Amino acid sequence: MKKQKNETVTLKKGGQDIQLDYSDLRKAVLVLRAVNHKLRQRIIDLLEENDSMTVTDIYIKLRLEQSVASQHLAILRRAGVVLTERQGKFIYYSLDKERLAQISRLVEELAG
């Protein structure tokens, strides 16, 4: 049976019914997949230590190919985990700490 975009699932938690939209669920899965990867976790840790960095800074520090670093940064950007800021010809990457806090709260709630 093919699910429609507007279809929802009802979850029960503590006597409460929670409506969960499948499209929202798919988006959440993409975000969780983005941060559940060893290399991307290393990038997140590096950005946390350094505030903002260029892709060149990142691939040199982590000893990666430039294309690999760019690909993983793009995944993190699409997930809303990193922000970009252009300064001249350089693009600086930084963490969206508010977004990471949201993800952390969600994971804690799901795990608990």
Which residues does each PLM region occupy?
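Short hinge/loop at the helix->beta-strand junction immediately C-terminal to the helix-turn-helix recognition helix
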Residues: 52, 80-81
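N-terminal leader segment of winged-helix/HTH proteins
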Residues: 1-35, 81
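Short, hydrophobic-biased segments on the C-terminal half of alpha helices
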Residues: 73-74
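Residue-level signal for well-ordered alpha-helical positions
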Residues: 106-107
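Alpha-helical residues within the helix-turn-helix
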Residues: 60, 77-78
